[in-house]
């Protein structure tokens, strides 16, 4: 037994005057509307006849039901679920209205009611503005509860004790209040949601819910389409109607998958629901289906041209003399060029597709002429199907005794999708236009998959008899309709003068076969996989970093062990020569190791030791070291090698370099057989005793024995200039020694340099001082 809604408006205490109820949607279940019989004061009306009429009326109400009143809003009552609202919802409901809904489901079931919104003014403590819910219908009903309140949170559901329940809404004088929206279902639908629930209300990445009938709300909107998904702010059930997974008149189960949002959501028209353009959101949702949603071959060419036929073809000759024919083979979706167009403009025209065998058809996509200069399209149509091409059946929704009218296009270029729920199992499909713009013209594509019968082999059908070209162009006879399913086209229908869409187009259908290609089918598996991979990757990266750090430390430690030092980069040709003076020489003999002693060290020596040192057979004079001249010195070291401390030394460190003394240090003589001391420098001043400052002079070093090569380059220049200065400065005496090899005198005395008067000006003195410091 289908659900029913009875709406009564009472204003007169003696005679109920029935006001015109708010028009119920044409797709609502049990659309018959009956009013209560008026009161009569006639005394001639016999009592038995009145009781008989009352009994007949009660039987009619029991079978069909009625909806009356002025306080009812959006109402869809299905056999297992439905949705109802107060009048003007979500705007403020008017004063002094009343509406009563009586809901009945099949025997053995109970009713569950859930509220999506409740906002009834409670200023009068629920005396004049309230919603009452009763168990049962009629005089035997018992009250479950009386509810009012602004913004009342009714999260719990209300259940009936039997298969019947009554809702009574009453409004008096009030200021505010949206009213209410409620949905119901049979008790076994534990996961019932309302038409206002969105994806953002649920935290699970995947979930399944039951959508009630009637969720195609006139005030709600969605954003998105398939297969890209819907914005998370879209109502779930309305998006399910648009996607084709549930029917607006029946409701159904949906399986939702949540994923990351996208920057832009497209607008599209499908199943009488228009989705609007949406912008970036944090998440989106889509629906899991079985996947029977592929194209059947109109666009791809799998369906051959002879398999596409029509009632008539539009042909004409233009002003240039060219013949134009918009044949049925041009009715392929997304193919450039003109569409199929009918020659006649009446409701007997059709476009037929032969699939060669039975297939499961889940939907259809249509478009107009796709030509801006020809604004032709079909705005409403019916679907007929057949197994043999002779006996045709009009598509209807389950439990509805009216033909399903599908909404078509609103312009000449946009694609519009409609789904079949339940799907059609047939070989032949006909599209019968009922409304159009100017001319009947369209392109189309069928959606579905192969049909595999369960428990029986595929049914083979014979192809329809061939048709000649004259029949194709001029056929206006209506198709044969199966008895009991749809009326026959026996009388010509009057063409419609307007393109107004009929009320039946608000009924929607759905397809269970939509696949989402942008969302992973199982999020929990991905989470488990990530929980395993992340620790493994962290361990691998940590191990790699440790290996690199250990290798770096080992390399540095190896360098320290080998004692490698970095040297400054000098010229490759002379860097080694310049380093010879800093590197210790490998002494072959004791005599080859030159030693330089400072004057302070000589002073520490006793006279006996000095005499012994000066009694060398041969003495060589060490060449002076000039700071900054690198690569021209032949002696590798000027330090005496450590041979142990002697008693005559006062310095603790024998390698201590000479300090800055107030007097000049003298070079020590270097004997050949023993420690060699630098020999005195003999300056040959005979050639330039009175040379002026501007004239260069020549000085030489004189030594006995093996004489090293003279210094050249800058060093000679410096010596020459020094000689020129020596004529005006103090002279140093040479030691009083005889020929090499002769015994030295008892005591060796060096004269202290004597200061003299300045010979030249301040400029000459400054110049000589500079060179003196260099030497």
Curated annotation (Swiss-Prot):
According to the record, the segments passing through the membrane are: 529-549
Note the superkingdom of the native organism.
Answer: Eukaryota
**Alphabetical GO biological process terms:** intracellular receptor signaling pathway; negative regulation of cell growth; wound healing
Report the record's disulfide bonds. 72-99, 126-148, 215-237, 292-449
Phosphoserine modifications at:
606
SMART domains recorded: CUB, FA58C, LCCL
Q: Which residues form the LCCL domain?
A: 187-285
Provide the glycosylation site positions. 95, 155, 272, 474, 516, 522
The keyword Glycoprotein belongs to this UniProt entry's keyword annotation:
yes
Q: What induces it?
A: Increased in lung cancers during the process of tumor progression.
Task: State a single Gene Ontology molecular function.
Answer: signaling receptor activity
Q: Where are stretches of biased composition, namely Polar residues?
A: 468-477, 491-517, 690-706
Tissue-level expression reads: Highly expressed in testis, heart, skeletal muscle and also in cultured vascular smooth muscle cells.
Residues covered by the F5/8 type C domain: 292-449
Query: InterPro entries given for it?
Result: CUB_dom (IPR000859), FA58C (IPR000421), Galactose-bd-like_sf (IPR008979), LCCL (IPR004043), LCCL_sf (IPR036609), Neuropilin_MCO_CoagFactor (IPR050633), Sperma_CUB_dom_sf (IPR035914)
Q: How does it sit in the membrane?
A: Single-pass type I membrane protein
Give me the Extracellular side stretches, as residue ranges. 67-528
Q: Which residues form a coiled coil?
A: none
Identify this protein by name. Discoidin, CUB and LCCL domain-containing protein 2
Q: Which organism is it from?
A: Homo sapiens (Human)
